[in-house]
């Protein structure tokens, strides 16, 4: 039975919209392609995946064929398949897949072939109208071998080629099943095909009838092109090819790239030629390696002093306190007319945004709303031209955050972005960007990107306060000076608390629940600490405002429940001292019910040790900067607990680094 249009509509909306970015690596050049692609995919393992595959052309012994190998599970399984059945060539594409349509099996792994077996496709994203397309293709006689939406793309390209063949019926040598050439260039067939797709996609395409050619197209999920010395690359993210070249073109939405051994040709979906915009990436390739650490996450925790320093560098004056944001396109005078700020973000970035609310309201004296980007456009928000939108995203490609940005723009708001990737989609639509110079973050659980986001938010809060004229030069200089001291203080924290967190992990790694408490700006850090623990150790953890204990969480407390309480203070800030005193009362509520308390406290606070079971001290800092320091022991505690529990720290189950569709 053929499904009705209504069924198509319903089913197409039931697609799993949380597909993360899969890994794509393509190569064309003089080298053997298999090692290049496999190594590139390995450098993209942080994205999360459950199957892998590769297609290769250019084998001198079989020049008119594409050889394909696939395997479920990790890359080592694919390598084992290749070891048993070797393939050779000088161009090809590889893919690591996160299952959304269909099970994580070899049949559903990419690359996927068309009906002729001569064309292959890899794909990151979701084809929303794949059911309707599939039904139409089946009616034409197409047969499908997988449960995926990606296979549809290969057949759509085949369909475009066959339509041209039909139009040219009678012309010799145009049958794609037997001909050594295509009726139209491969890139033209791809351009025609992508116009029929609804959804998000970044694709790579090879055809046995278009040797030494790799075609890529993008609409939504990220894709980058690499320009080397007589060799060219395609990848879904920079680390996949950074060890070969630093010369990168970020493929834009609506672009099609044709890679050959002589260069890259770029067009839009209509075939109009476009120039390459090659950027030199400053990341050192070694930044994307473990550098001797057991896990990427531990390496990235220890890189936080540099991440904070680099995010601050060049943006503040240590002599005047002035803040400079060179990528700001909003005129300074315009900041006077904004009546409010709306922050939209997801996950860890949302926690950073919630902390940013306290920074911006305290320094710039302007109301701030913080929204989950995934909820924002569905609640009928009412921003206008007096609302400043601030989007926070590590990758710059998070689908929900991009959608929130478009909603803000649609309703007349100007938007700014805090992002870790130069040239990402979020930055291109924004009127200003603060790049978090954290470098590539490989571990799925964010660490250094979070502290860099907190730093960027603090810098922006100062910038906004200065443009609004609500902060004195002396106050600005004080805050800038204190910010400049944070990297050294982070180094102190890393040196002093790692062993202590490791010892605490021995005590608490078998617990089934954790509670994290904080007040004011420390509450978002409690949320982040709980998220880190649940992400990588699979322990249920909850963050809660300490002042809300009487409204429910007290019922959970007994001798089996560890309670992590952020009890830091800035003695020079009366409001900070008041929150600290209130927090001590909350700690006593916990201990009165036999709860076990781990306190994060400020150096010099020895009295708190009389109230709690364990104390982790961090250096003193102004109230608004303490979150950058106090999150580090929470990261390390989560890390050591996860390691003791035998969890995959860098690639937690059911999670991936970036989510590029809803």
Predicted regions and their residues:
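Glycine-rich oxoanion-binding loops at beta->alpha junctions
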Residues: 94-107, 319-332, 356-392, 398, ...
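Conserved short alpha-helical segments that host acidic/polar catalytic motifs at enzyme active sites
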Residues: 14-295, 299, 303-337, 473, ...
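N-terminal amphipathic/basic-hydrophobic helices that include classical n-h-c signal peptides
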Residues: 1-20
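Generic C-terminus detector
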Residues: 271, 297, 596, 621-662
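Acidic/histidine-rich
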Residues: 197-231, 509-537, 567-569, 577-584
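Glycine-rich phosphate-binding loops that contact phosphosugars or nucleotide phosphates
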Residues: 333-485, 568-577, 581-614, 637
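Active-site phosphate/pyrophosphate-binding segments
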Residues: 304-342, 422, 432-567, 643-662
């Amino acid at each position: 039975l053929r499904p009705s249009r209504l069924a198509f509509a319903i089913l197409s909306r039931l697609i799993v919209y949380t597909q993360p970015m899969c890994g794509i690596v393509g190569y064309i050049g003089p080298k053997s392609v298999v090692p290049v692609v496999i190594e590139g995919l390995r450098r993209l393992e942080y994205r999360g995946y459950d199957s892998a595959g590769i297609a290769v052309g250019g084998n001198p012994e079989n020049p008119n064929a594409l050889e394909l190998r696939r395997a479920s599970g990790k890359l080592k399984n694919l390598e084992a398949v290749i070891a048993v059945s070797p393939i050779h060539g000088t161009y090809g594409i590889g893919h690591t897949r996160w299952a959304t349509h269909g099970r994580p099996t070899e049949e559903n792994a990419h690359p996927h072939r068309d009906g002729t077996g001569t064309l292959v496709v890899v794909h990151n994203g979701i084809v929303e109208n794949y059911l309707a397309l599939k039904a139409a293709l089946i009616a034409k006689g197409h047969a499908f071998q997988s449960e995926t939406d990606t296979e549809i793309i290969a057949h759509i390209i085949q369909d475009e080629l066959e339509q041209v063949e039909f139009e040219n019926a009678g012309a010799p040598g145009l049958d794609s099943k037997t001909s050594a050439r295509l009726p139209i260039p491969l890139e033209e067939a791809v351009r025609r095909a992508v116009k029929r797709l609804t959804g998000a996609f970044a694709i790579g395409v090879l055809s046995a009838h278009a040797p030494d050619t790799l075609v890529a197209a993008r609409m939504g999920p990220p894709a980058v092109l690499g320009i080397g010395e007589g060799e060219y690359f395609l990848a879904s993210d920079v680390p996949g090819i950074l060890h070969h070249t630093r010369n990168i073109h970020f493929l834009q939405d609506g672009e099609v790239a044709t890679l050959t051994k002589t260069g890259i040709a770029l067009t839009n979906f209509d075939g109009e030629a476009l120039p390459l915009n090659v950027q030199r990436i400053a990341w050192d390739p070694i930044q994307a390696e473990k550098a001797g650490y057991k896990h990427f996450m531990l390496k990235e925790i220890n890189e936080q002093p540099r991440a904070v320093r680099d995010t601050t560098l060049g943006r503040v004056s240590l002599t005047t306190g002035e803040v400079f944001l060179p990528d700001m396109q909003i005129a300074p005078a315009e900041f006077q007319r904004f009546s409010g700020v709306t922050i939209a973000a997801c996950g860890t970035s949302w926690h950073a945004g919630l902390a940013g609310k306290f920074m911006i309201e305290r320094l710039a004296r302007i109301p701030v709303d913080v929204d989950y980007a995934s909820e924002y456009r569905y609640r009928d928000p009412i921003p206008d031209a007096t609302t400043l939108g601030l989007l926070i995203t590590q990758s710059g490609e998070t689908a929900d955050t991009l959608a929130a940005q478009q909603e803000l723009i649609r309703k007349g708001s100007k938007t700014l972005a805090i992002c870790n990737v130069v040239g990402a989609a979020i930055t291109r639509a924004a009127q200003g960007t603060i790049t978090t110079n954290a470098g590539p973050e490989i571990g799925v659980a964010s660490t250094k990107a979070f502290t860099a986001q907190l730093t960027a938010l603090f810098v922006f809060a100062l910038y906004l306060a200065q443009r609004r004229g609500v902060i004195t030069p002396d106050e600005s200089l004080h805050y800038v000076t204190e910010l400049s001291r944070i990297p050294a203080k982070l180094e102190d924290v890393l040196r002093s608390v790692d062993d202590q967190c490791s010892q605490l992990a021995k005590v608490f790694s078998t617990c089934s629940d954790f509670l994290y408490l904080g007040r004011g700006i420390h509450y978002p850090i409690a949320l982040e600490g709980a998220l880190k623990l649940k992400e990588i150790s699979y322990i249920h953890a909850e963050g809660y405002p300490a002042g809300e204990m009487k409204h429910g969480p007290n019922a959970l407390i007994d001798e089996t429940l560890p309670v992590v309480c952020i009890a830091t203070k800035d003695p020079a800030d009366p409001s900070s001292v008041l929150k600290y005193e209130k927090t001590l009362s909350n700690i006593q509520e916990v201990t009165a019910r036999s709860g076990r308390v781990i306190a994060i406290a400020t150096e010099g606070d020895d009295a708190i040790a009389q109230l709690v079971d364990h104390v982790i001290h961090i250096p003193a800092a102004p109230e608004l900067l303490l979150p950058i320091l106090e999150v580090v022991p929470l990261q390390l505690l989560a890390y050591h607990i996860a390691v003791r529990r035998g969890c995959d720290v860098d690639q937690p189950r059911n999670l991936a680094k970036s989510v590029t569709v809803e």
